[in-house]
Design a protein with these regions (language model features):
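Mature-chain termini and adjacent capping regions
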Residues: 1-445
Length: 445
């Protein structure tokens, strides 16, 4: 019987050994695979990574990434699937920066993305935006998570509530609310109403001062709306918000100020050109020019099919009406050594009349409906009216007087003339000089 007992013991030991080996094999299969060693230049890597910072109880920034890796012995983090929120100090809004890949230097609070970057400004923390938000696309973007400022030197495109734009390079400071478009700037400002003309803004560089509602164009800028152009140096474009009949609000360009400026309105059968050392142009809510003020070496030329009228003075104020979404010259006030020259233009079947030159300290010109021809010219100070001959039979004449009122018929022909204290001088023609005809002088009260 002893051998039977030995056989049973051996069988039991063998069974235990087999069970142990099977269990060991099963446990070994369940052990997780040993992670791969990190590259020698990395400290760590991870999925779904984030970092955030608060300042005085308010969120400062929140940076998340689908993946990240940290360079060994460095504060540099290489990120992919990146989302950066830069919160306003008031805590009511934030700017959002997204990119496929970026680098963040934690010690420097510096975020940089070499590739394509999408930026959305001033997203409200609660509720829907009151208007379309500013959206920016660029590359090579650097952000500072302490100051929340952004900067790039690469081509940049913008989409905003009233249009689009592009520039080479841009920067934005949410603390001062200043947006800079660095060079080769163009904005296309779309009208709010169907049928109205868009306005194109061009500049060497642009600075948008949001808190002042001003756009600075430096060192030069140009605004074009249909056939209307205003350009100059150190332009300041002022915008303001208007409320529509339905209660909706929109932002419009209402004023442009510039130095060494010039402009033009060119339409079929009429044109206006002007220049001055300093110009202020006012627009209505549809973008139509309504008033232009020129100071210092001010000059205006209004041209119709029959006449070119030139106004020169130290100061010129022009008032415009609006017709069919176009500006129409209605009135000109010239002060400080004003000179108004009306010169007839050649036309088939019509002889040229004299050129009229009016000089006074203050001259007012009122235009006929449609802005092509003069209706009335008034001097609000003593003046001199000179007639320059354009035909051999015409006389050179001068007339001095006070409170002159000159009424014009169509095609800028003098219809009536009134003055007080008149003194005239009429010079003989060349033919009359051959007959020794003398100068004629007259005077009247």
């Amino acid at each position: 019987m002893r051998w039977v007992l030995l056989v049973a013991i051996v069988a039991m030991v063998g069974g235990v050994a087999i069970t142990y080996r099977a269990s060991k094999k099963a446990l070994k299969a369940q052990v997780p695979e040993k992670p791969k060693a990190l590259p020698s230049d990395l400290n760590s890597n991870a999925l779904d990574w984030y970092i955030q910072e608060t300042t005085k109880g308010h969120p400062g920034y929140h940076l998340t990434a689908k993946e990240y890796s940290q360079v060994k012995d460095s504060s540099r983090l290489d990120l992919s699937g990146v989302r950066l929120q830069l919160f306003a100090k008031e805590g009511d809004a934030y700017d959002l920066v997204t990119s496929a890949n970026a680098t963040y230097f934690t010690n420097e609070h510096r975020f940089f993305s070499e590739g394509e970057v999408q930026i959305t400004l001033n997203i409200p923390m609660q509720g829907e935006p009151k208007h379309q938000l500013v959206s920016i696309q660029s590359s090579g973007v650097a952000c500072n998570t302490e100051t929340n400022t952004m900067d790039t030197d690469q081509p940049t495109s913008f989409v905003f509530e009233h249009g689009t734009g592009h520039s080479n390079g841009a920067s934005y400071d949410p603390n001062s609310r200043v947006l800079v478009m660095k060079s080769h700037v163009q904005l296309d400002w779309n009208p709010a109403h169907p049928g109205a003309k868009p306005m194109k803004i061009e500049a060497a560089s642009l600075i948008y001062q949001e808190t002042k509602s001003e756009i600075w164009l430096t060192p030069w800028g140009r605004l074009t709306r249909g056939d209307t152009v205003v350009e100059g140096q150190q332009d300041v474009v002022r915008i303001h918000e208007v409320t529509e009949a339905d209660g909706k609000k929109r932002t419009v360009i209402h004023q442009v100020e510039a130095v060494k400026a010039r402009g033009s309105d060119t339409y079929p059968n009429r044109s206006v050109q002007y220049s001055a050392d300093w110009v202020l142009a006012d627009f209505d809510d549809e973008g139509v020019t309504r008033k232009i003020t020129g100071r210092g070496s001010a000059q205006l030329t209004s041209t119709s099919p029959t006449t070119a009228t030139e106004v020169k003075a130290g100061s010129v104020d022009m008032e415009f009406g609006a017709r069919n979404d176009e500006s129409v010259l209605e009135r000109v006030m010239a002060t400080d050594n004003a000179v108004v020259t009306s010169r007839p233009l050649p036309a088939p079947g019509r002889q040229l009349s004299e050129t009229h030159v009016l000089r006074s300290q203050v001259v007012e010109v009122r235009m006929r409906e449609g802005g092509r021809d003069m209706e009335t010219v008034i001097t609000h100070a003593p003046g001199t009216l000179e007639f320059l001959p354009n035909q051999p039979a015409q006389h050179h004449r001068t007339l001095d007087g006070n409170d002159m009122v000159i009424a014009y018929a169509p095609q800028n022909r003098i219809e009536s003339f009134h003055t007080t204290g008149a003194r005239t001088r009429t010079d003989p023609t060349d033919e009359e000089k051959k007959r020794n005809q003398a100068v004629s002088l007259t005077a009247s009260r």
